[in-house]
């Protein structure tokens, strides 16, 4: 450990109060000029994920995405995460950039393959050292670290043993989570166990890693949730706030002629994860479907582990799901056979969805799952903007984010218990099977690794400083 790291550790906890200061009794407001103010203590942040930005693929462990992205035909244009944004070597410069852009909280993920390269057994000190340095750098610049423990990057050895379809993976996750907490827990207060387990269980079977169409998907769902529940044991190890991040989408039926389909799709897309984690039971629709797809062992006892208190529910929002009244079914989601969708269910809606869907979703979550604070852990849009010298104009992104934040403000005014917002993403990055074609609020020249803040990054800096939107935005 360096001297600077020891100094930063001695002052541990600096900045953590920002996330701990959740909204209590403070209301969002609109002033006479039409400006929109967010609640006192509202959390403003930005997000990334390890495999999407770190690079350094030959250093400190190999994950399933390293293998998948090197498989011909799996990723657009043959892109890989070998170098990505080279954040592994440039993290200090990136943190200084974030500080200059006014970021207060940074959501990142820890790469499991760097910490426990074989999935179980010895912990890799070099992997922990990297995140140790990253956390100290963040705190040194007044930025609160907000790590996610699993963002789809599974050690390849565990994938070879069955991945999340194997029950043992949940227990290996708990061991890994404890190892990370032992190293970082003296300075990190808030933790997210899993990011978008729906993607790891379903989307991975044909678009993302591992790409195996015969994965027992509902068994993987259950084991991901079990891993989340086992990860919540960090509370007894001293963790402050613990949460789970889900990708959630309102389901819209085209017309009454699609009766019944909407509730079934909502159960598969949303309640399949919400209900076990927050209510201690699976939706009846999912139980019926599971009966034909998975043998879960002892789900009753497992649900006691899965259903433990969480401090925050992270919401990743990009799109709604709209059912069509006509046309052929176009999806590969088990349990939704015969239901027609306006677009394939597995495709993330880029560049950006209608923001009013987010308002609807936040109000529904606060109504159906009271007592759990909400935080938007990802939201953003991708547009085909290009650098023009030292500037990158992206007015479409600014318009989208403005409309989204207005919808978010409306939801708070209507009673949603929303406590924060993380824009996706800080940097252009490796967008999984899409390669490098999606974009963040900071432009990255992948030849020189130069970073150029887009106009949206400067706009977002002003939003954070004002804790709100000006009239006319």
Swiss-Prot record:
Thermal effects: Thermostable, retains about 70% of its activity at 60 degrees Celsius.
Catalytic activity: Hydrolysis of terminal, non-reducing beta-D-glucosyl residues with release of beta-D-glucose
Active-site feature positions: 196, 378
GO BP, sorted A to Z: cellulose catabolic process
EC category: hydrolase
Compartment annotation: Cytoplasm
PROSITE patterns the record matches: GLYCOSYL_HYDROL_F1_1, GLYCOSYL_HYDROL_F1_2
GO molecular function, one term: beta-glucosidase activity
UniProtKB keywords: Carbohydrate metabolism, Cellulose degradation, Cytoplasm, Glycosidase, Hydrolase, Polysaccharide degradation
Cited InterPro entries: Glyco_hydro_1, Glyco_hydro_1_AS, Glyco_hydro_1_beta-glucosidase, Glyco_hydro_1_N_CS, Glycoside_hydrolase_SF
A Gene Ontology term for the protein's cellular component: cytosol
EC numbers, comma separated: 3.2.1.21
Primary residence: cytoplasm
Similarity field: Belongs to the glycosyl hydrolase 1 family.
Further remark: Shows greater activity against cellobiose than against aryl-beta-D-glucosides.
Protein known as: Thermostable beta-glucosidase B
Organism: Thermobispora bispora (Microbispora bispora)
């Amino acid at each position: 450990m360096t001297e600077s790291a020891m100094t930063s550790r001695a002052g541990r906890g600096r900045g953590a109060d920002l996330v701990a200061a959740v909204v209590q009794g403070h209301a969002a407001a609109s002033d006479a000029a039409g400006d929109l103010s967010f609640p006192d203590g509202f959390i403003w942040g930005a997000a990334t994920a390890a495999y999407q930005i770190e690079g350094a693929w030959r250093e400190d462990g190999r994950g399933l995405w390293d293998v998948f992205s090197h498989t011909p035909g799996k990723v657009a244009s043959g892109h890989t995460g070998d170098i990505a944004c080279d954040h592994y070597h440039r993290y200090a410069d990136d943190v200084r950039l974030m500080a200059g852009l006014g970021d207060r909280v940074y959501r990142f993920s820890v790469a499991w393959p760097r910490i426990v390269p074989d999935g179980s057994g010895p912990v890799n000190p070099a992997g922990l050292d990297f995140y140790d340095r990253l956390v100290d750098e963040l705190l040194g610049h007044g930025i609160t670290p907000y790590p996610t423990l699993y963002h789809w990057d599974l050690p390849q050895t565990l994938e070879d043993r069955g991945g999340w379809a194997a029950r043992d993976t949940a227990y290996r996750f708990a061991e890994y989570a404890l190892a990370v907490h032992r190293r970082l827990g003296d300075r990190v207060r808030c933790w997210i166990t899993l990011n978008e387990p729906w993607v790891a269980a379903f989307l991975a079977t044909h678009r993302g890693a591992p790409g195996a169409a015969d994965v027992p998907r509902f068994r993987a769902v259950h084991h991901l949730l079990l891993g989340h529940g086992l990860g919540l044991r960090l509370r007894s190890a001293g963790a402050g706030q613990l949460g789970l991040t889900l990708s959630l989408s309102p389901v819209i039926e085209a017309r009454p002629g699609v009766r019944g389909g909407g509730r079934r799709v909502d159960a598969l897309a949303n309640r399949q994860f919400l209900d076990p984690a927050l209510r201690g039971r699976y939706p009846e629709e999912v139980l019926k479907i599971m009966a034909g797809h998975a043998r879960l062992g002892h789900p009753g006892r497992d649900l006691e582990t899965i259903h433990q208190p969480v401090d925050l529910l992270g919401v990743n929002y990009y799109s709604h799901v709209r059912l069509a009244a006509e046309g052929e079914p176009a999806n590969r989601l088990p349990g939704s056979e015969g239901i027609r969708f306006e677009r394939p269910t597995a495709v993330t809606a880029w560049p950006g969805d209608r923001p009013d869907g987010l308002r609807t979703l936040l109000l529904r979550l606060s109504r159906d799952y009271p007592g759990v604070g909400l935080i938007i852990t990802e939201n953003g849009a991708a547009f085909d903007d290009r650098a023009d010298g030292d500037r990158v104009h992206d007015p479409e992104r600014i318009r989208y984010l403005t409309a989204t934040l207005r919808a978010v403000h409306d939801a708070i005014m209507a009673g949603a218990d929303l406590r924060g917002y993380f824009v996706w993403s800080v940097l252009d990055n490796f967008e999984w099977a899409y390669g490098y074609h999606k974009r963040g609020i900071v432009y990255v020249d992948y030849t020189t690794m130069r970073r150029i803040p887009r106009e949206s990054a400067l706009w977002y800096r002003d939003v954070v400083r004002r804790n709100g939107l000006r009239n006319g935005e």
